[in-house]
From Swiss-Prot:
Region (Disordered): 1-79, 109-146, 166-200
Domain LIM zinc-binding: 221-280, 281-338, 339-398, 399-456
Protein name stated in the entry: Transforming growth factor beta-1-induced transcript 1 protein
Main localization of the protein described in the UniProt heading: other
Sites bearing N-acetylmethionine, chain numbering: 1
Short motif (LD motif 3): ranges: 152-163
Lineage: Eukaryota, Metazoa, Chordata, Craniata, Vertebrata
Length: 456
């Protein structure tokens, strides 16, 4: 396009120098008429000065007049003009070869209505400020006929003008007639598209533009919730596709697009709803278990809640003991529920002795008077207490009053005590008192002779 503008500028300069020849002064022909000079003030399309010059140079005049005989200086100018027109036709043929690419580029880069209106106002203000050059009396020469590329360019510019005018008007107003072009007599302008056609065209252009940019426009499947096609953002989960606003928690309807979720029976749930509805409950606090879990005694527990119900300490390597469905540590279980020793009343943990209808620690089953262990495994019982032989007879009064040993055979009962037969003697002469006669003084037995001698 820059080459075309430069060539048109050269042609304008060449045309401006033509009136200087003497032949033109004798018979000034009519000035060259362009389609833009015949249009009224209300029919101006708002195009720039370069575009006006392009139309006035390319378009075929309506009624060309025969030119006067050319003088030698004028024939040289005509040769220069013919060469320029040939160059213009060559450039237009190249433009015709790339018309489809130009059309796509123009349609994809439509300016907004505000920008177009601003450009038209600026162009009109510049045209008013710019002084109009005096018409140069140059002869009208026969020009080559417009080529097919020229016709195609006129049709494209007319369509573009129609589309811009339609965008400027409100949707409810009537559709204005298309702006006339320079080739309106040869090629009629296409009718303005309807609103539905314009919408379909714009949607098609948008879809093609997105496709060229690598953005997919086809449906990405049916939503797993509303069963409608998905276009745009999509969430893929549970083997299906979802609209982002439809992939929500099955309990509280919270959006789950960018957060973690749990699945139950094919439905997504947020962590709060999933744990509240489907997680096992702790046997102590009755709250849902979210992470680690201990299974014992037919129920589930938080690890920090599975502890001794008596002391509250967690169970170590020694494990736990159960009583009526409740866990206890070993120490508290034995302290609360283990059998008690009859001697020390402490819990029996290991070995024990069963005697006198009770359980005893081996170290606690001794004589309850002297705490001496029983030799030979035999013991004597008195009032439910185990005693050795001596303390048993002492409790029952069956010890010899002289030697202090138990009396197991024959005995002599005197003075409220028991004696071995050989140990019941006179306190002074130590003779046995076998005859059964004796005297007593201060709780001691005496024979008759010694009593008379001592106390006579």
């Amino acid at each position: 396009m820059e080459d075309l503008d430069a060539l048109l500028s050269d042609l304008e300069t060449t045309t401006s120098h033509m009136p200087r020849s003497g032949a033109l002064k004798e018979r000034p022909p009519e000035p060259l008429t362009s389609p833009l000079t015949q249009m009224g003030p209300g029919e101006s399309s708002g195009a720039s000065g370069d575009k006006d010059h392009l139309y006035s140079t390319v378009c075929k005049p309506r009624s060309p007049k025969p030119a006067a005989p050319a003088t030698p200086p004028f024939s040289s100018s005509c040769g220069v003009l013919g060469t320029g027109l040939c160059e213009l036709d060559r450039l237009l043929q190249e433009l015709n070869a790339t018309q489809f690419n130009i059309t796509d580029e123009i349609m994809s880069q439509f300016p907004s209505s505000k920008e177009t209106a601003g450009e038209q106002k600026e162009d009109q203000s510049e045209d008013k400020k710019r002084p109009s050059p005096p018409p140069s009396p140059s002869p009208v020469l026969p020009k080559p006929s417009a080529t097919s590329a020229t016709l195609e360019l006129d049709r494209l510019m007319a369509s573009l003008s129609d589309f811009r005018v339609q965008n400027h008007l409100p949707a409810s107003g009537p559709t204005p007639p298309p702006v006339p072009s320079s080739m309106s007599e040869d090629t009629p302008s296409p009718p303005g598209p309807t609103s539905k056609g314009s919408l379909d065209t714009m949607l098609g252009l948008l879809q093609s533009d997105l496709s060229r940019r690598g953005v997919p426009t086809q449906a990405k499947g049916l939503c797993g919730s509303c069963n409608k096609p998905i276009a745009g953002q999509v969430v893929t989960a549970l083997g299906r596709a979802w609209h982002p606003e439809h992939f929500v928690c099955g309990g509280c309807s919270t959006a789950l697009g960018g957060s973690s979720f749990f699945e139950k029976d094919g439905a997504p749930f947020c962590p709060e709803c999933y744990f509240e509805r489907f997680s096992p409950r702790c046997g102590l606090c009755n709250q849902p278990i979210r992470h680690k879990m201990v299974t014992a005694l037919g129920t589930h527990w938080h690890p920090e809640h599975f502890c001794c119900v008596s002391c509250g300490e967690p169970f170590g390597d020694e494990g736990f003991h159960e009583r009526e469905g409740r866990p206890y540590c070993r120490r508290d279980f034995l302290q609360l529920f283990a059998p008690r020793c009859q001697g020390c009343q402490g819990p029996i943990l290991d070995n024990y002795i069963s005697a006198l209808s009770a359980l005893w620690h081996p170290d606690c089953f001794v004589c309850r008077e002297c705490f001496a262990p029983f030799s030979g495994g035999s013991f004597f019982e008195h009032e439910g207490r185990p005693l050795c032989e001596n303390h048993f007879h002492a409790r029952r009064g069956s010890l010899c009053a002289t030697c202090g040993l138990p009396v197991t055979g024959r005995c002599v009962s005197a003075l409220g005590r028991r004696f071995h037969p050989d140990h019941f003697t006179c306190t002074f002469c130590l003779r046995p008192l076998t005859k059964g006669s004796f005297q007593e003084r201060a709780g001691k037995p005496y024979c008759q002779p010694c009593f008379l001698k001592l106390f006579g």
